[in-house]
Structure formats: C-alpha cells, structure tokens
C-alpha cells in the first residue's frame, strides 16, 4: 500500500518549523470561487502545527511558500505560491496550531485599482505590463491567434485583476499555472491544443475499495445539456457606415437539440470582420461551455486545472479519450503529524474535478466592462507649437484629468470624434476644437473605449468672447486667427431697442450668390470703403432715387458709354467746371431750347431767342481769319474690373490614368488627355458676337425704372486684363506660386499681350507665373486668343485671325538632355495652347518673319500648332509644313517648373491634378517593390508623391473636376509610332481616364502610407541624386532666391534635371524623408533645452500649470524675451508669443528671469 506525506516550506523559515495537518484547495482554468472567496487559478487553505508558538504575520504574510506532496517518499506534486492570509489557533502542550492561505502571486493584482489608457497595444502586451508592474515575470503566452492592436483601451475604475480578466475573456484567453521548484509560472492559452498533457493515461476504476497502489479515477459522470446553438453579433464603424459588420457563427455537435437558439448582441466590440469572426466564435464557445461536461473523483494528485489527460479502462469506449481538467478540488489529511498529541490515522488524499472533452475550448466568463456614469470633462491636446491638431475626419486628441500617465500632448489619447451641429455629404457645420479647449466627452453605449466629444465649455482661462452677464443678450460666433492675432465674428444683439447683427472679417469677406439678391433697408444705408471699390454689372443697371442724389469726387471722374447717353431733368440742368467744358461729337451737336440760348465768354455773348439772334462784344469779326479754340479731349482711364469669385462646389467625380498608359503616352510624346477648353462661365465674347440678354427684373417693393435704350457692343473693346486676383504694379494679375500657371492653363488662361493687341482682338486673359509669360515678360510679347465658346462643338465660326508671337530663345546648353527638355516642353506648350477645330475648315499656317527675328504666325482655324526641333510646323490635312526663319532656332527656352527629362503632358497633368496624385499613391506598393526600377518608374513615383504633398490646392482640385467632366473624348486615335504607343487596346486617350468617385479617393488616401512608400524608393532615390545635387542651388533656395523662370534651365539640379526636386525647390522646403539626400550645410540653429523632460508625468503637469500662470501674468516681459529667444534660434518673429511658445520655452523663461520662483516650483 502506498504511503503519502505532506510538507510545507515558507520563505525565511527553517524547513522543519511547520508541519502540515491537512489542506483543502481548489484549482481552476482562470478565475472561480472557492469557499466564498475569489480563486485566481488556485487557492489552498492549509492547516499547520508548529513547536514554535510565537510565529507572527510579519514572518508569514506576502512570503513565498511551497506545499509538497510525497508518495512512497517520492515528490509527486507541489503547489508554489504566496501567503495571502495567516492565522494562529490554539496553543497546545507541544504544538501551536496555525492556518495559512496559499494563492498565486497574480492575486496581488486584486489589491491595485486604477484608471488609465493603453494605446496601440495588443492584449498580451497590456497583460504583460500589468504583471510586470507587480514584479511578476514568470508568465508565458501560448496563443493560436495573433494579437491585434487595440487603438484605445481604457482601464476605468477597476482593479488590475478585473481588467486582466476582462481583456483575457474578450480575446478568449484562459490561464493556469505550472508549478516548479521555487516558482509558479502563469500560463495563458486560447485553445485546448496549447495545454500541457500528462505523460501517462489514468485508469478508471468503477469498484472503489481495497488497497490499490496505482492512482485511478472513479465516479465519472458525463452530462449533456441544450445550450445556445448560434451567435450573431453586429457593430458599426464610422469609417464604413454602410457596412453591416454582421457576424454569424453556428455551433457544432447539435444533433441532440434544436438549432433555433440564437444569441444576438450589439455592439459586438469590434471594427473589422477578422476580429468580429473571432469574437463571435469566442462568445459561442463560452455560451456552450456547459453543453458537454463530466465530473468525477480520483486519488491522482497529478490532475490539475489546465492539464489534459487520457482516460482508459472505462467500460464505455466513448469515455476512453482525452479530457481537459477545468476545475479540481483537493483534500489532504495528515493526522500522524501530531503523534505526540495523540494524532493517529493514515495520511489521505482525494480530489473532485470537472472536465470537458479535449477537442473543445473552455472560455472564461466575460467580465462586465465598467460603464461610464455620465459625461466627462477633458482638454484638447496636441504637439507643442500647434494651435489646431486634427485628422482627415476632424477628430482631435484629448487629455482626461484622471489620466496620470500621459504628458498632455498628442500621445494622450486616440483620435476622438467630434459631434457637429450638422453633418452631411460634403455639407454641414464644422468647428474643430483647438488645443487647450475644454470639451465635454461622452461614451458610446457607456463604453470607456469609445469616447466622443459632444460639447464645449468655457472655464476660468478660456472665457466667453464678451463679458457676462453684461452682454447676456448677445449670441456670438467668434473664431480666432490661426497662428496670428485677430478674429472673424458673427454676433446677434437681442436687447430690445438695440437689436443688431454684427459681422466682422479679419481680412477678406467674399460672397457668391447663384441667383437673385434682394435687400430692403427701411432707413439709412452707410457704406465706407477706405481703399478702392470695383463694381461690374454684366447686364443692365436700373437706379431710382425718389428724392435727391449727390456725388462728390475729389479727384477725377470718368464716364465711358459704348452706346448713347440720355439725360433728362425736370427743371434745371447745371454743369459748372472750374476751367473748361469740352463737348465733341463725331458728326453734329444740336442744342435746342424753347425760348432762349445764350453763349457767353468774357464780356461778349451770343443770344438766340424768339426775337432773333443777338451778338454783343467789344468787336464782332466775321470771316476775319483766326482759328477755333480746342478742348482737352477725352483722356479718362477705363475702370478696373472687380475680383471674381470661384463657386464653392463639391468635388466632381474625377478620373484616373493608368500608370502603364502614362508611360506609353510619354514615350510617344503625345498628350494623354484632350486640351481643356474654356468653361462656359470663363469664355469671353468675341467682338460683335453676343446678343445682350433682356434686363433682369428687380424684386418688389420698388418698381424697376425703364431703361432708356439697350446697350450695344462696340468694335473696340478694352482688354480684360484680370480675373479673380488683385492688381499688382508690375502686372495686372498675380497668382500664388503654388499654382505657377497650372490653374490658369486649366481654366483656359494664357500669357499676357500688349494693350493694343488686346484691343484689336477684343479680350484676352493673362496669368503672371505662366510658363510663356516668364519667357516674354520683359518684351511683353506672346499672345493667344481662345474661341468665344467651345461647348459641344458650337461657335467655331466665331474664331478670329490672331497673332501669336513666339520669342526666339536659342538654346545655350550643351547637355543633350537639356535640349530635349526644351523641345518637349515647347511641344506641350504649343499643343496645350491650341484646341481641335472644325475638321472641314482648317487651313495651314502662313509663316511671316518679323524684322527683329521673331516668328509671327497667322492662325486661321488651324488644327494643331506644334513646335519641335528647329522649326514650327502645322498639321493640316495630313501635310506637315515646316517654317524656320534663316539663322534662327525656333526652339523656345523652357522656364516652366517641373520639366525634367520626361517633360510630357502627362506629368504636367499630374502636377496640376491633386486628386490624381493622391489616387496614384495607391499603386505605390506594387510599383516600388518591383526589382530594377528604371528611371521613368522612379521619377513618376517620386514626382506623384511629392506633388501630392506640396500641391494640395483644394480649389484647383474642384476646378479640375469641373473641367474634366465637360471634356469630350478625343476624336482621333493615338497613332502608334516607332518609339511609342503600340497597344491596340488603347484607341483613344479617353479610354485611360476611367472615373473615380471622390469617396474612393478618400479611401485610398486613408490607406496610403507615405513613409512606407519612401522606404521602398529610398535606395533608388539616393543613388540617383545624392552625388549630383548642386549644393549652390539648394542654398540659393534656402536664401529665398528664385531660379529664373521657376525652372531648371539656369540651375542644374542633378544630372537628370529632376522634376521632382525642382518642385521641392519651388516651395523652398524638403520633406524629412529626403533631407539625407541633400548636401549638408552648417547650421547656426541652437538646440532647445528641454527642461521639463527631467520630471515624471505627475510632476511635469504641476510644473507646467505653475509656469503657465507666471507667463500669463508677466505682461510684455515674456513677449520680449521670447522674441529675442526666437532670434537666437534663427526663427521668424511672431505676434502671439504666449500662445505659440512651448511649455519648455516658458519654463526656460521662468528659470532665467526668476530663479528663486523656479526652485520653489520644482521643489
């Protein structure tokens, strides 16, 4: 018969100090309850005796202990843990009785309670942090499913152990323990396959009794019960609002029950299908964990929770299989430990257990997630130096007052959505909370992991725009200028007798009304313009003044009327001039009066009345010689036109070009898209080609005055030298450098022309920064006239004969690549400044050479004008006519930015189309991962990437979308040639422009990763540019200089004339990803001292608050110091120093100017 014995060892005590009288313990997969107490994997109550009567809690509690079980003097099992509780019982003649509770070190987590935020970490990573904080390093994970990062995971007002159990249950993790000498290891698993298995099967013995040396199982009962048969979970994500996220999982082994027991729940706490499917299966496993169970008893001490074993010798063959121990209770008695006190009887051991079949997975009971009781207050945070920090969805980062671990910066939280008053598809209301604003945060379904900002509040520092309650009757919408001083405001005053609507624009105030605008003012109207006022009325103007009208002009007044001028007064009409009145008519002047006409000068006069003609003067001369006097003549200047407004339209569905088609079109030197015609609203009338519309009606209550006559167009129109920009001294219009003529070309704008030429041809639109303008600015030459309308093939008959003067600009560069660049660029310029004309009426060009060597070409309904090589040719009726004046090169020098060795219309189009640049980014992964990228692929990739970052012109994107919708497919096929397009599938350019919805572009952008893209192309980019990049050019742009013509002909950027880097230089900035490829320059910028880095997060927050208070109350002292500080850092001045300065900079000021106060703060 086998003999049993028990012993225990406690840290710090001699091995023989304590003897085991008995024990009662429980083990379970994950947590359970034992004797009314929480059991975190295992819990043992051990009865002890000792000859030492004065053992104290200090010697026992929180110490490591190990209970050992011997069989035939061989150690067969051990339980290692910590002493949670210790008690002293009776003191006998020889022994004192004690009792201790042995638990895992994991139970220490139940004594910690916390609130904090974990970001972008997997559940195993979070659990590891919890364990390591308590000094628990003996743990392991055996997981079948890869952990998915949780964007935002909050431990909210719960103990560390509850938080651990909640996360583990959500991910389907269970834990058990492996006991070894001197330690116990916490073991996490998510499948029964990962559990340890006993090396030997355990026999089953139905006939309990007698002396059996081998441990066995008896009293095994197998139980089957009906449970949930199907789980269906559902959730929602704002990133995919139309997607259902519905997940359904059907149970197995359901032959014994109905299959209609569905468990539905929402939200399912997932945001993608992969997690949704896993969570649904975990939920089903939990709900069916009692469907197939077994209970039994044994005397095998090797049985432990979290272990598998094989059963044998059962009379039912189906029971002889593998099983998983889910929970087990152990009992042991050792009465002979007290033989001196009369103890007698054999040492015994037994256990009772619960099992599940080995192929099933046990899931822990899901723990309830803490619910947030109500709204919270938080502060909007972001990087130092920023005022507004948001993402593409308008989400912001926030910091909660209870968050002790974050530094109150952009790492404090996930992106948090912001409730807006109105949110539709590209319409609604948007107001981004700014850094430092206090916001009200609520939580979807009370879930602390799903915060949403639902309101904003003022506090003692952020006060309302007007003092209260003094201005309690005001309703105000006031903004604040970003990175500057000022505000925009719309406010309403509702005090009786003082009602007012107030509107303040810090800079410009623009408005666009698509139809009528009616204003009724029932009292006075005052208008003060402190600079110029421009008004343009494109149809009729009716003005009725029912009392008197006065005008005072301190300078000159010019009135120019193309038609007739009719003036009618009811009584007297008086014209008085200080010096001269000059009346001139082309044919006749008639002055008629009912009773009298008098002409008076000096003392003489001529009077005509019914009595006759009376002449009176000192001397009356008739036919005595002399000459008539002359007047000054008309010398008035024409009024300038007002700045226009582009309509705020939604993005039209754009179109993309396949990358392969781009390369093919590039090789063929042909346009990839049709030239953009003028839109209807941009088209300007040819002379005498427009019938004026009837005058528009004027809304009541005032009756419209009757027009005297309808205006008629004249043959000598003044030039329209302006568009939607302000005039500058050197040229009529000025466009921002970010467009560099691209917007102008898309809108049908071309280069400037002299005023006399503009008069001759009616109208012309000009654009400073246009490529040809940059070449011809000094000579003020080069012109092109668009047709009056190119809508649906109409109005071709209104084309006039126009002069195009292309300036001869001989090539001075020997580099073959540079010469080719100019040829290709001129090809683009010429083909984009023409359009398709009526096929039946085009004529060849007639070359005329001017005396100064320039080309003067008469264009009469030409189909194409193409400049290439050393001549200019016209394609007409299948013939090519080349015209080259003697001794001159026709190649025009290229000064337009962005033209590299592949100066093709396709790449030019890329530069002007932000939506295309963005859509191309989705192709980077496959393009940049290919081996042996050639220069063309690399150039296109880098070019598109850089332009997508640095040419984000929203209005341009909108405009481009409008125009591309109005383009018609090119009528002719792309003709293959020896060098280019040979793909028979691509028959015209329109086939490579499939439409792409704006929402799709947004989706592509959200998935793109610029850094990953740059990582792929970095080696090729570095090898291409690192050695040949000109240091002088880079420094030239750093110093604010401009390469002539915004191009690369006067500044060699590498040996490839890179369009990518030329664009960067145009913006005088280089992204961090490319800095390593640029020449290093000596930097005089000092590094900023980071005083606050020395403090822990709690201390840092306190220091920042006190420093901020000192700075805000410093008057202008801090502002002056900050200005000198920025000067020392080679940074430009700012106006709002207290808002722009970082916390470290403010701390530096306190330390320098008030060191005693600084020492008090940090102490």
UniProtKB/Swiss-Prot annotation:
Q: Where is the ACD domain?
A: 728-1163
Cite the binding residues for ATP.
Answer: 739-743, 808, 995
Q: Where in the cell is it found?
A: Secreted; Host cytoplasm, Host cytosol
Consequence of gene disruption: Deletion leads to a loss of TseL secretion and in turn loss of its ability to mediate prey cell killing.
User: What Gene Ontology biological process does one annotation of this record name?
Assistant: isopeptide cross-linking
Spell out the molecular function terms from Gene Ontology. Answer: acid-amino acid ligase activity; ATP binding; magnesium ion binding; toxin activity
According to its UniProt record, what is one Pfam family this protein matches? Phage_GPD
Keywords on this record? ATP-binding, Host cytoplasm, Ligase, Magnesium, Metal-binding, Nucleotide-binding, Secreted, Toxin, Virulence
Q: Does the keyword Transferase apply?
A: no
Q: How is the cofactor bound?
A: Binds 2 Mg(2+) ions per subunit. Can also use Mn(2+) ions instead of Mg(2+).
Binding-site positions, Mg(2+) 2: 743, 805
Q: Which cofactor does it need?
A: Mg(2+)
Kindly list the positions annotated as binding Mg(2+) 1.
743, 889, 1066
First-level EC class: ligase
Which InterPro entries does its entry note? ACD_dom (IPR032074), Gp5/Vgr_OB (IPR006531), Gp5_Vgr_C (IPR054030), T6SS_RhsGE_Vgr_subset (IPR017847), T6SS_Vgr_RhsGE (IPR006533), T6SS_VgrG/RHS (IPR050708), Vgr_OB-fold_dom_sf (IPR037026)
UniProt signal peptide:
none
Gene Ontology cellular component?
Answer: extracellular region; host cell cytoplasm; host cell cytosol
State its Enzyme Commission number(s).
6.3.2.-
Superkingdom field: Bacteria
Q: Which NCBIfam families match?
A: vgr_GE, VI_Rhs_Vgr
Instruction: Tell me its family.
Output: Belongs to the VgrG protein family.
- What is the annotated role of this protein in its UniProt record? Part of the type VI secretion system (T6SS) specialized secretion system, which delivers several virulence factors in both prokaryotic and eukaryotic cells during infection. Forms the spike at the tip of the elongating tube probably formed by hemolysin co-regulated protein/Hcp. Allows the delivery of the TseL antibacterial toxin to target cells where it exerts its toxicity. Also acts directly as an actin-directed toxin that catalyzes the covalent cross-linking of host cytoplasmic monomeric actin.
Subunit structure and binding partners: Interacts with protein VC1417.
Put simply, this protein is called: Actin cross-linking toxin VgrG1
Q: Which organism is this protein's natural source? A: Vibrio cholerae serotype O1 (strain ATCC 39315 / El Tor Inaba N16961)
Q: Which gene encodes it?
A: vgrG1
């Amino acid at each position: 018969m086998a003999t049993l014995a028990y012993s225990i060892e406690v840290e710090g005590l001699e091995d023989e100090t304590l003897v085991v009288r008995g024990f009662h313990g429980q083990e379970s997969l994950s947590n359970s309850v034992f004797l009314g107490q929480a059991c975190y994997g295992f819990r043992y109550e051990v009865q002890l005796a000792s000859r030492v009567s004065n053992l104290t809690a200090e010697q026992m509690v929180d110490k490591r202990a190990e209970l050992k079980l011997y069989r035939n003097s061989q150690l067969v099992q051990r339980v290692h843990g910590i002493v949670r509780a210790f008690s002293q019982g009776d003191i006998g003649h020889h022994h004192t009785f004690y009792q201790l509770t042995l638990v895992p070190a994991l139970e220490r987590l139940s004594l910690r309670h916390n609130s904090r935020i974990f970001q972008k970490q997997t559940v195993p990573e979070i659990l590891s942090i919890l364990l390591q904080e308590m000094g628990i390093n003996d743990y392991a994970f055996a997981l079948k499913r890869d952990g998915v990062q949780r964007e935002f995971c909050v431990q909210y007002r719960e103990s560390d152990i509850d938080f651990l159990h909640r996360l583990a249950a959500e991910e389907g993790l269970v834990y058990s323990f492996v006991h070894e000498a001197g330690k116990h290891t916490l073991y996490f698993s998510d499948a029964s396959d990962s559990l340890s298995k006993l090396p030997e099967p355990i026999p089953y013995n139905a006939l309990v009794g007698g002396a059996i040396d081998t441990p066995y199982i008896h009293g095994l009962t197998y139980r089957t019960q009906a449970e949930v048969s199907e789980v269906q979970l559902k959730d929602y994500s704002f990133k995919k609002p139309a997607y259902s996220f519905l997940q359904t999982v059907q149970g197995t082994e359901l032959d014994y029950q109905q299959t209609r027991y569905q468990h539905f729940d929402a939200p399912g706490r997932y945001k993608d299908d992969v997690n949704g499917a896993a969570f649904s299966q975990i939920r089903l496993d939990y709900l069916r964990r009692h469907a197939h169970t077994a209970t039994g008893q044994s005397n095998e001490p090797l049985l432990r929770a979290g272990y598998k074993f094989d059963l044998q010798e059962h009379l039912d063959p189906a029971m002889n299989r593998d099983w998983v121990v889910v929970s087990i209770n152990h009992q042991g008695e050792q009465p002979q430990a007290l033989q001196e006190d009369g103890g007698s009887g054999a040492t015994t051991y037994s256990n009772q257990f619960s099992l599940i079949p080995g192929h099933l997975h046990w899931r822990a009971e899901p723990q309830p997630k803490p619910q947030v009781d109500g709204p919270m207050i938080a502060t909007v945070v972001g990087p130092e130096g920023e005022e507004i920090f948001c993402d593409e969805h308008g989400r912001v980062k926030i910091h909660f007052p209870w968050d002790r671990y974050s530094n109150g910066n952009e790492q404090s939280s996930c992106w948090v959505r912001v409730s807006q008053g109105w949110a539709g598809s590209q319409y609604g209301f948007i107001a981004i909370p700014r850094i430092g604003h206090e916001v009200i945060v609520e939580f979807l379904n009370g879930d602390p992991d799903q915060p949403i900002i639902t309101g904003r509040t003022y506090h003692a520092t952020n006060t309302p725009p007007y003092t209260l309650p003094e201005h309690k009757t005001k309703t105000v919408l006031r903004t604040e200028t970003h990175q500057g001083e000022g505000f925009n405001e719309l406010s309403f005053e509702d005090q009786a007798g003082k009602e007012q609507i107030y509107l303040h624009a810090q800079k410009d105030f623009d408005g666009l009304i698509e139809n009528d605008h009616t204003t009724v003012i029932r009292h006075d109207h005052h208008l003060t313009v402190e600079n110029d006022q421009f008004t343009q009325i494109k149809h009729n103007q009716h003005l009725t003044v029912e009392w008197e009208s006065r005008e005072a002009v301190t300078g000159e007044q010019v009135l120019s009327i193309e038609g007739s001028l009719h003036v009618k007064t009811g009584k007297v009409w008086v014209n008085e001039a200080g010096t001269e009145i000059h009346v001139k008519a082309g044919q006749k002047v008639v002055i008629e009066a009912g009773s009298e006409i008098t002409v008076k000068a000096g003392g003489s006069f001529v009077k005509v009345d019914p009595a006759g003609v009376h002449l009176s003067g000192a001397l009356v001369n008739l036919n005595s010689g002399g000459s008539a006097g002359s007047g000054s003549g008309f010398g008035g200047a024409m009024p300038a036109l007002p700045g226009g407004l582009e309509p705020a339209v939604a993005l039209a569905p754009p179109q993309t070009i396949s990358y392969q088609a781009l390369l093919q079109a590039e090789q063929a030197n042909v346009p990839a898209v049709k030239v953009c015609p003028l839109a209807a609203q941009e088209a300007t009338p040819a002379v005498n080609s427009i019938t004026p519309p009837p005058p528009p009606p004027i809304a009541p209550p005032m009756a419209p005055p009757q027009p005297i006559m309808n205006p008629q167009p004249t043959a000598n129109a003044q030039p329209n030298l302006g568009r939607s920009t302000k005039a500058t001294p050197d040229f009529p219009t000025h466009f921002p450098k970010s467009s560099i003529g691209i917007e102008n070309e898309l809108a049908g704008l071309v280069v400037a022309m002299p005023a006399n030429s503009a008069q001759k041809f009616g109208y012309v639109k000009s654009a400073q920064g246009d490529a040809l303008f940059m070449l011809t600015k000094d000579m003020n030459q080069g012109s092109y006239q668009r047709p009056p309308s190119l809508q649906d093939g109409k109005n071709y008959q209104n084309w006039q004969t126009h002069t195009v003067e292309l300036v001869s600009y001989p090539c001075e560069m020997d580099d073959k690549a540079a010469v080719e660049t100019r040829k290709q660029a001129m090809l683009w310029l010429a083909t984009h400044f023409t359009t398709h004309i009526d096929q039946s009426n085009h004529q060849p060009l007639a070359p005329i050479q001017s005396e100064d060597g320039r080309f003067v070409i008469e264009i009469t309904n030409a189909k194409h004008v193409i400049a290439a090589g050393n001549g200019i040719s016209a394609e007409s009726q299948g013939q090519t006519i080349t015209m080259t004046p003697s001794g001159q090169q026709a190649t025009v020098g290229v000064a337009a930015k962005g033209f590299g060795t592949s100066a093709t219309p396709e790449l030019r189009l890329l530069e002007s189309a932000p939506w295309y640049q963005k859509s191309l980014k989705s192709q980077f992964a496959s393009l940049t991962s290919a081996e042996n990228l050639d220069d063309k692929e690399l150039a296109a990739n880098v070019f598109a990437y850089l332009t997508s970052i640095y040419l984000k012109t929203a209005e341009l994107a909108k405009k481009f979308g409008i125009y591309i919708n109005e383009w018609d497919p090119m009528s002719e096929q792309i003709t293959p040639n020896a060098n280019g397009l040979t793909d028979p599938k691509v028959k015209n350019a329109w086939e490579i422009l499939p439409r792409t919805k704006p929402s799709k572009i947004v989706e592509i952008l959200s998935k793109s990763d610029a850094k990953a893209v740059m990582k792929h192309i970095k080696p090729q980019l570095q090898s291409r540019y690192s050695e040949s990049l000109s240091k002088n050019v880079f420094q030239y742009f750093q110093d604010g200089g401009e390469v002539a013509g915004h191009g690369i002909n006067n500044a060699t950027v590498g040996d490839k004339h890179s369009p990518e880097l030329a664009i960067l230089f145009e913006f005088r900035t280089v992204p961090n990803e490319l800095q390593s490829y640029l020449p290093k320059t000596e930097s005089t910028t000092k590094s900023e001292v980071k005083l606050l880095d020395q403090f822990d997060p709690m201390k840092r927050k306190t220091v920042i608050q006190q420093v901020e208070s000192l700075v805000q109350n410093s008057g202008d002292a801090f502002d002056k110091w900050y200005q000198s500080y920025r000067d020392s850092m080679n940074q430009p001045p700012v106006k709002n120093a207290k808002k722009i300065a970082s916390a470290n900079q403010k701390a530096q000021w306190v330390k320098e100017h008030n060191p005693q106060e600084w020492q008090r703060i940090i102490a």
